């Protein structure tokens, strides 16, 4: 599919956890239950000490691999992964009770403004499995802003996801987005590094676990402590 030039339009790719919302420890607890059931793997403080619970910017399959592969081996990891992810999604759905999902400051107003702008195509760029992403976005009603995206269920490699999102944007809108017409919005160093490696723009926000100083060191095109100032955030995204 050839598509037309984006001509001043923007494809804005949003991360979920730490950027759009927080679901507390729900996803972590769901992962732990899943790994206990599917691999017999149990959490110990040593895993925390070795940094294995830094999930920021990673895909769900990558998270499972990093947690268990050293202890269960590559063959058992691969064999058990489909069931582990299935159990994770079941646990996630069970634990996402009312009040567990909290939108980040300013994000609802920002999404409304972006969605109303005819220059903007919104999509997701997330390490979440697609079903997991939709489960998290349902409580605040954010699914309506994101008709498509690229997910951890498309590839375990985060850096392979933006081209998938661009191709889906072409199918959805008929526009071919490239270079600086693509904007990655996220809260992790991986979001910024991903944007830089692909030659697209990145807008970082320090509403996740990564400090503003750490994000700034990666050289995003714009950096915010939060999106509470929606006018500034909007301008930075669509410039």
Where are these regions (language model features)?
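Histidine/lysine/aspartate-rich catalytic loop segments that bind and position anionic ligands
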Residues: 138-169
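Non-catalytic pre-domain segments flanking phosphatase-related domains
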Residues: 1-14, 181, 232-235, 239
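Active-site neighborhood of HAD-like aspartate-dependent phosphohydrolases
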Residues: 2-51, 56, 65
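Acidic, Mg2+-coordinating phosphoryl-transfer loop and its flanking beta/alpha structural elements
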Residues: 184-222
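Conserved Lys-Pro-Asp/Glu-containing loop-to-beta segment of HAD-superfamily phosphomonoesterases
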Residues: 161-192
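Metal-dependent phosphoesterase signature
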Residues: 68-109, 117-118
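Substrate-recognition element of Asp-dependent hydrolases with the DxDx(T/V) motif
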Residues: 19, 107-138, 150-156
């Amino acid at each position: 599919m050839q598509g037309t030039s984006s001509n001043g339009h923007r494809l804005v790719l949003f991360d979920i956890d730490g950027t759009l919302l927080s679901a507390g420890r729900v996803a972590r607890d769901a992962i732990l239950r899943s790994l206990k059931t599917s691999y017999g793997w149990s959490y110990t403080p040593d895993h925390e000490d070795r940094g294995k619970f830094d999930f920021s910017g990673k895909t769900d399959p990558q998270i499972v691999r990093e947690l268990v592969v050293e202890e269960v081996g590559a063959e058992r990891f691969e064999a058990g992964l489909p069931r582990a992810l299935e159990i994770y999604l079941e646990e996630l759905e069970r634990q996402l009770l009312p009040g567990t999902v909290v939108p980040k400051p300013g994000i609802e107003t920002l999404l409304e403004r972006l969605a109303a702008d005819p220059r903007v195509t919104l999509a997701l760029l997330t390490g979440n499995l697609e079903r997991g992403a939709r489960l998290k976005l349902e409580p605040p009603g954010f699914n309506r802003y994101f008709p498509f995206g690229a997910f951890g269920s498309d590839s375990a490699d985060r850096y392979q996801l933006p081209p998938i999102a661009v191709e889906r944007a072409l199918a959805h809108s008929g526009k071919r987005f490239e270079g600086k017409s693509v904007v990655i919005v996220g809260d992790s160093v991986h979001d910024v590094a991903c944007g830089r490696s692909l030659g697209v723009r990145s807008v970082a926000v320090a509403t996740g676990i990564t400090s503003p100083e750490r994000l700034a060191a990666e050289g995003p095109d714009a950096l915010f402590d939060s999106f509470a100032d929606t006018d500034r955030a909007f301008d930075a995204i669509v410039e």
